[in-house]
Amino acid sequence: MRRSLLPALALAGAALLLAGCTSAPSAAEATTVPSSAPSSPTPTPTPTVEPRIVVSLDGIAVTDETGTRDAAFDDPDAVLDLLEETTGQLPEPEKVETLPGYDFSFVNYTWDGLWVLTDTEHERAASAAITGASVGGVPITTEEGLSVGSTRAELLDAGAWALDDAEDPATAEFLGLGGREAPGTESLSRPGSTGIVYTLFWFDGDTVKQVQVPANDYSDL
């Protein structure tokens, strides 16, 4: 059954009549609606920076919430100081057997996941070998983002090459990546050509087990 609209219309008419009989409020009687307080802006959350260690041909860089700090391999003391600051420890140097043809000796500083090789007096450039996926709990990679545990397929996609032209990169035990000329040197594998420095990857099957930086093709060290 439909409801009649008459009662509602009647009420509406009465309301209009009452409104017409009521005088308009004076300005003093006008109701003031309080303005709402301005809302405080929502603070932007500070981005979280994941600590990481990156090893390049030139040296080591550490990034964390305080920023990025780096040290060049040409300054072994700076490299060791940076790693001590990052990991909270500086291992005792381990003497390396003197190599034939060299009139100076070498020492290794070995962390779990990394070792740094330099001469005893720290007068010559250092080099590093990545032996684990992290050092002191901090992930460590090359500047390409590769690390211990990376696959051969990832290296080949990045442009890695076999050290010997006679080897197949798909099966070679060692692969090189990158390459930058070292003026004043001569390549041992490419006589007559300027030597290069590069990143060396050592494989166990198809998985990287060690990364050496910087490697070169002009010395037998």
Q: Which residues does each predicted region cover?
A:
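Short helix/turn-capping signatures at newly exposed starts of structured segments
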Residues: 22-171, 195-221
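Bacterial N-terminal signal peptides that target proteins for export
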Residues: 1-11
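Surface-exposed intrinsically disordered loops and tails
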Residues: 175-191
